[in-house]
């Protein structure tokens, strides 16, 4: 059911964003007949013990991890392929690039007797793996806590931590040069790069604060609620969630160049998980209600079954 739900969510949101929400002043209704049911074009079998199941931006591919290995499936043919790592290295983290059929992978590999963490990209069209850069030497207990990137500026941010106080955020630029990024706060949980600005937005869940880099600044909001970064859309609009319990009850949103006092705010009909909140290409906020099997555009009030 989890896999089916994922397909439905991504597919529905893709259709809503690319078809229903196309920017146009005219609307034309047409009858569409399908020669074959859409379900006939999907043939997916994922092992029951698979983890980290993810889907590519346009739905052509699905991926999952099993142990420290990564597999990819073509959703149309059902072909399952193992993604090979350098020197049989361990996949520590992966995600699909936004608006690209390409995977970003952080892997632990042994080079000349030393364990390293390196960043690579994988192209499913030709099975090509490209080294971006080595991140750091691997130390016991290290985990990749967060990764964010911009396909518009070709910049990556990688946050690495372990249980011994090692916490580092690295910025990798278009030339694959790597820099340390100093962060404020004591409990970074979520971080996203502004697509066209190369500024990192991140939250500190311990102190319920939101920060921006370049320069490193705390964003101030007129609320007593706990705050959490939900995401940033392709138009550089930042979405901050007001937290009630462990769910989002309201959203404050705007651009980094604007005073936060002028940002918009909206209340949700009922608290939602941050993972069920999305944004379309027009910077409208969508909430996926799995129980009621519908998606609501809370910016316009429209609902889509």
Model-derived segments and their meaning:
Residues 13-17, 21-22, 69-73, 111-121, ...:
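Structural motif
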